[in-house]
């Protein structure tokens, strides 16, 4: 065993039973398969990093890792109370919260991983549904032992595809397949795990086969027909593809936090508060989760996770975090949000603070800020990160610097795959049309949001409304009613029956004709035709901002 050999009390069979149970949990809570894969990885790495495990808490570790994975990838997380229920109240809610924080601190919030499934998705894009399901099946089979960590993700994905092709064309009476599997290390590993799982009575494994519409009797026949040679030895190894570079940040202790002096409140919301503080004689911004002694919220988990892997001059920096009775994020301080800078009553004072004379927000300054916003967005999308909630309140300014903040709604997007619209929490005025019409989405929702922010910066709010239906009607009244082919699936939102023609934004066109033409391309109803962040930046770089 790779991770578990140092724990005499926890066997590989115990691990298999845990994974089988997590498969059941994943179906009960209708999680995507990616969530299950991430949870398994987190279990293995946590076990690998700690010195001692009490076997009676092994299941607690499993359900906590599943809960963490849902916070990263699902529209709704399982929650500590449901974790207590799922585990038949073996562990109190307080114990579950404590273990979850221990896992997060031990892993240092390093939760964005390249998985076998990531490598597989792009390779099986054009497969039949049956072959795709078989690929997913063997991905989970590969992770029923912790030896999957001995192989690069790409290699396992390639082995899965070879095996799926082999089974798809399998003639029962042929012995050639036995030789082919035995001469390929990864296929042999996959087959050995398939044989183990098929010959044990595993409820989760049975559910997996049933839900993926795989013929169990056929698989049983295959495992009896194909005989493996004596076991190969897999030496313990850490698969470096599971790790991504992290920015350094501190884990502040209680004593550090007690030395904070609050200078002023910068804002508050449903998440909690943000304060400007001095910490160790330096200024910082501290975001504090509102609830006391509660599990860390999905937004806080996401924010720490994504800020740990990002390093760009137009992205806010995370100095560190503290997981106490309240979760605290220690962030780079900035003077103002873009929203406050543009529309609040403190306009004159802020202009003075930011070094802008005569209360004039010049056209060059507007272009300069927009370019910085696009530089940050380009960086996000190049790293497969969807921000998910870009608004004027989530853009910060200090003097000539602009930085993107608030990554609580951010997601990793896989190439050629779209995210479930239910995972989006984008603010109403900045919400892309596909989200309003309950369509799945990709990184282009951020481009739509930036178009709306550009409107604010240039002096013309693009869309408003008190609910989804009002916003949709407002969008249609400016951009025209879209072709129904673009949004043909059903939606629970009331769509305007009136047919609108394109009229655009007359005031904006009159003052900024060239920029407005770019904004229209950023607001394309069809996300495939919508201009990318990189292309938008290229267009804005043609304008002078000196």
Swiss-Prot record:
Coiled coil: none annotated. Residues 1-112 form the Cyclin N-terminal domain. Disulfide bonds: none annotated. Keywords: ATP-binding, Kinase, Nucleotide-binding, Serine/threonine-protein kinase, Transferase. SUPFAM superfamilies: Cyclin-like (SSF47954), Protein kinase-like (PK-like) (SSF56112). ATP binds at residues 266-274, 287. InterPro entries: Cyclin-like_dom, Cyclin-like_sf, Cyclin_N, Kinase-like_dom_sf, MAP_kinase, Prot_kinase_dom, Tyr_kinase_AS. Its EC number is 2.7.11.1. The active site is at 389 (proton acceptor). It catalyses: L-seryl-[protein] + ATP = O-phospho-L-seryl-[protein] + ADP + H(+); L-threonyl-[protein] + ATP = O-phospho-L-threonyl-[protein] + ADP + H(+). The keyword Cell cycle does not apply. Residues 260-544 form the Protein kinase domain. Pfam families: Cyclin_N (PF00134), Pkinase (PF00069). One of its GO terms (molecular function) is protein serine/threonine kinase activity. The keyword Isomerase does not apply. PANTHER family: MITOGEN-ACTIVATED PROTEIN KINASE. Belongs to the protein kinase superfamily. Ser/Thr protein kinase family. This is Putative serine/threonine-protein kinase L268.
């Amino acid at each position: 065993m790779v991770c578990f050999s140092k724990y005499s009390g926890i066997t590989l069979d115990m691990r298999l039973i845990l994974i089988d149970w997590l498969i059941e949990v994943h179906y009960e809570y209708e999680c995507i398969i990616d969530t299950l894969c991430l949870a398994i990885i987190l279990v293995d790495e946590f076990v690998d990093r700690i010195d001692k495990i009490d076997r009676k808490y092994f299941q607690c570790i499993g359900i906590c890792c599943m809960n963490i994975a849902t916070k990263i990838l699902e529209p709704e997380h399982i929650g500590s109370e449901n974790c207590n229920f799922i585990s038949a109240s073996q562990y109190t809610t307080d114990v579950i919260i404590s273990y979850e924080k221990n896992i997060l601190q031990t892993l240092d919030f390093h939760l964005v991983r390249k998985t076998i499934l990531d490598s597989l998705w792009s390779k099986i894009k054009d497969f039949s549904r049956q072959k795709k399901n078989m690929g997913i099946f063997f991905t989970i089979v590969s992770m029923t032992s912790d030896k999957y960590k001995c192989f690069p993700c790409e290699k396992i994905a390639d082995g899965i595809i070879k095996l799926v092709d082999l089974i798809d064309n399998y003639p029962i009476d042929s012995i050639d397949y036995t030789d082919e599997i035995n001469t390929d290390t990864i296929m042999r590993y996959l087959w050995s795990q398939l044989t183990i799982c098929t010959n044990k009575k595993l409820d989760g494994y049975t559910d997996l086969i049933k839900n993926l519409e795989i013929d169990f009797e056929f698989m049983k026949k295959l495992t009896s027909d194909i005989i493996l040679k004596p076991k190969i030895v897999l030496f313990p190894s850490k698969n470096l593809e599971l790790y991504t570079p992290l920015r350094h940040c501190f884990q502040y202790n209680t004593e550090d936090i007690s030395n904070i002096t609050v200078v002023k409140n910068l804002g508050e919301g449903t998440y909690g508060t943000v304060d400007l503080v001095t910490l160790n004689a330096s200024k910082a911004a501290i975001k504090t989760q509102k609830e006391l002694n509660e599990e860390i919220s999905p937004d806080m988990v996401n924010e720490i996770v994504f800020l740990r892997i990002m390093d760009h001059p137009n992205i806010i920096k995370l100095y560190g975090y503290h997981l106490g009775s309240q979760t605290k994020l220690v962030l780079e301080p900035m003077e103002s949000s873009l929203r406050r800078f543009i529309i609040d009553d403190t306009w004159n004072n802020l202009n003075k603070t930011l070094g802008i004379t005569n209360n004039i927000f010049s056209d060059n300054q507007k272009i300069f800020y927009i370019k910085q916003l696009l530089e940050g967005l380009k960086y996000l999308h190049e790293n497969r990160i969807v921000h998910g909630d870009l608004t004027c309140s989530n853009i910060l300014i200090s003097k000539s610097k602009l930085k993107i903040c608030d990554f609580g709604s951010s997601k990793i997007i896989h190439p050629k795959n779209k995210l479930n619209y239910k995972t989006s929490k984008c603010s109403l005025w900045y919400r892309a049309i596909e989200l309003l019409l309950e369509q799945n989405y990709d990184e282009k929702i951020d481009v739509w949001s930036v178009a709306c922010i550009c409107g604010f910066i240039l002096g013309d709010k693009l869309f408003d409304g008190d609910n989804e239906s009002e916003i949709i009607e407002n969008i249609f009244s400016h951009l025209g009613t879209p072709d129904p082919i673009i949004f043909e699936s059903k939606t629970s939102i009331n769509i305007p029956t009136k047919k609108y023609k394109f009229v655009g934004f007359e005031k904006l066109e009159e003052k900024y004709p060239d920029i407005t033409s770019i904004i229209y391309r950023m607001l394309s109803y069809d996300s495939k035709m919508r201009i990318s962040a990189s292309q938008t930046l290229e267009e804005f770089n043609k304008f002078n901002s000196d």
